[in-house]
Amino acid sequence: MARIFVVGAGVVGTAVGRAFVEAGHAVTLVDLSPARVDALVASGLDATTQLDLRGEPSSFVFLTVPTPAGPQGYDLRAVASASRDVGVAIGQAHAERGAAGRHSSRRDARTEGDGYAVHTVVTRSTVPPGTTTQLVGPTVARASGTAEGAGFVLAANPEFLRGESAEDDVRWPRLTVVGARSRRVAERLAALLAPFGGDLRLFDSPETAELVKCAHDLYTATRISFWNEMALVAGRLGIDAGDVATTVAGSAEACADPARSARAGAPFTGRCLEKDADGFLAFARELGLGMPLLGAVVGVNRELVAPPVADLRDAARGRVLDLREAERQEAAWRPAPV
């Protein structure tokens, strides 16, 4: 049984807390709202307005605070505030254990093993890549008077929850992502999460896990906008957009073989993709419809054609799409001339 604290008891935090309780762990939810805390307590959960780690030699502390976006980007003030609170609580816990704990020498987080008396601070909120290491970690360190690897360790475990089914999405996740610079920290957190099932991916940096979550949401948003654009065209032509979407969902290479289309570093090419993108944009204009998303796709592709292949190889870490092979594969699908 693990000792778990969930800082931020909104939709995500409450769902996470309930799932851990059901899994048999000792869980305390922390929220600044007394009314919310009272409601949680009334529902049978342990909740408080102030994080207290005294008497806790080790724990998992999940940050599940809101990160709304505005004109200036993500608002990370709640993350910073929660990180300060976590740091203060860690500092108080170390002070209680005495000078030996408070002044322990810094140890590399990569060498920490199971059973060590530190607190694992886990960023569960959706944040831009770098937040865990550049904001959460330094803030906790300053507020606690301890160093990462001595009094606490860091990990990112972004949520993939839907508002209408948040609790079920925690109980039965399709995907769980863990990122930490320490392999042992990642494995400890993975061991805590593995019983929930689903595809579990471990990465060697919090930034990778954070970017996975951002890319996941943005990819979903892009596909929705794509079909909204296509629905405008279908509507203008009197065609049922649903029939088109459900058919393409099973036929397009990006859907039938997602891994094949997930390679980055080179533009799409061949006889069909470029031609159809340009041609359909012109067709939509004839219908009096703008297609800004498709137009942006074409624009990005043209920009990628310009850099030398060496630059693309660097961007893709050596994985450059073999354009000639792509054209050969495409040719195999074209009917023979008659």
Question: Whereabouts are the PLM-identified features?
Answer:
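NAD(P)-dependent Rossmann-like dehydrogenase/reductase catalytic/cofactor-binding core
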Residues: 235-338
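Short, well-ordered coil/turn residues at beta-beta hairpins
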Residues: 63-65, 124-125, 179
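Local beta-strand N-terminus motif with an aromatic residue
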Residues: 57-58, 118, 173
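Internal alpha-helical scaffold of NAD(P)-dependent oxidoreductase catalytic cores
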Residues: 138-157, 162, 166-256, 283-289, ...
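Rossmann-like NAD(P)(H) cofactor-binding subdomain of soluble oxidoreductases
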Residues: 69-160
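NAD(P)+-binding Rossmann beta1-loop-alpha1 motif at the extreme N-terminus of oxidoreductases
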Residues: 1-52, 56, 60, 322, ...
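A short, flexible beta-alpha/helix-coil linker loop
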Residues: 66-71, 208-209
